[in-house]
UniProtKB/Swiss-Prot annotation:
One Pfam family, short name: Tyr_Deacylase
SUPFAM superfamilies assigned to the protein according to its UniProt record, in alphabetical order: DTD-like (SSF69500)
Motif Gly-cisPro motif, important for rejection of L-amino acids positions after renumbering to this chain: 137-138
Function: An aminoacyl-tRNA editing enzyme that deacylates mischarged D-aminoacyl-tRNAs. Also deacylates mischarged glycyl-tRNA(Ala), protecting cells against glycine mischarging by AlaRS. Acts via tRNA-based rather than protein-based catalysis; rejects L-amino acids rather than detecting D-amino acids in the active site. By recycling D-aminoacyl-tRNA to D-amino acids and free tRNA molecules, this enzyme counteracts the toxicity associated with the formation of D-aminoacyl-tRNA entities in vivo and helps enforce protein L-homochirality.
One term of GO molecular function: tRNA binding
Designated name of the protein: D-aminoacyl-tRNA deacylase
Domain characteristics, as noted in the entry: A Gly-cisPro motif from one monomer fits into the active site of the other monomer to allow specific chiral rejection of L-amino acids.
UniProt family annotation: Belongs to the DTD family.
Compartments reported by the entry: Cytoplasm
Enzyme nomenclature, EC number: 3.1.1.96
PANTHER family (alphabetical): D-AMINOACYL-TRNA DEACYLASE 1 (PTHR10472:SF5), D-TYROSYL-TRNA TYR DEACYLASE (PTHR10472)
GO biological process, one term: D-amino acid catabolic process
GO cellular component: cytoplasm
Native organism taxonomy: Bacteria, Bacillati, Bacillota, Bacilli, Bacillales
Length: 146
């Protein structure tokens, strides 16, 4: 499982012109799931994301987590994270999990984040989405479960 994590001042996701998820201060997560991923991967990433110290403290050091600063999560499924561009001119998405495997794990990750006390907004799984954000920093990290 891969997550591109972006610290954001604000973000929203729309589907067919309708806002389906929006946050102020917090994290935008682009979540990719592959064939061998399990609920344990989802739990591991939820813990890592909730406690990763990437927000600045009063001294200007990255010393606080999204939980510490009262931030929220905007979680978006993103199968294209498993696109392989090494051959040809069109990405190969064979490493991305099928929706019937990926969607329950996506929901599990979001549920674990909520259980850790975070407010979670989501996109719509499998939909074409427009994502807008104001990247804070910018701080962008790739977090993987394996």
């Amino acid at each position: 499982m891969k997550v591109v994590l972006q610290r954001a001042k604000q973000a929203q996701v729309t589907v067919e012109g309708e806002t389906v998820g929006a946050i102020d201060h917090g994290l935008v997560l682009l979540i990719g799931i592959t064939h061998g991923d399990t609920e344990e991967d989802a739990r591991y990433l939820a813990e890592k994301i909730a406690h990763l110290r990437i927000f600045e403290d009063e001294g200007g050091k990255m010393n606080q987590s999204v939980k510490d600063v009262g931030g929220a999560i905007l979680s978006i499924s993103q199968f294209t994270l498993y696109g392989d561009c090494r051959k040809g001119r069109r990405p190969n998405f064979m490493e991305a999990a099928k929706p019937e495997h990926a969607e329950p794990l996506y929901e599990t990750l979001n549920s674990h984040l909520e259980q850790l006390g975070l407010h979670v907004e989501t996109g719509r799984f499998g939909a074409m989405m427009d994502v807008q954000l104001i990247n804070d920093g910018p701080v962008t990290l790739l977090v993987e479960s394996k």
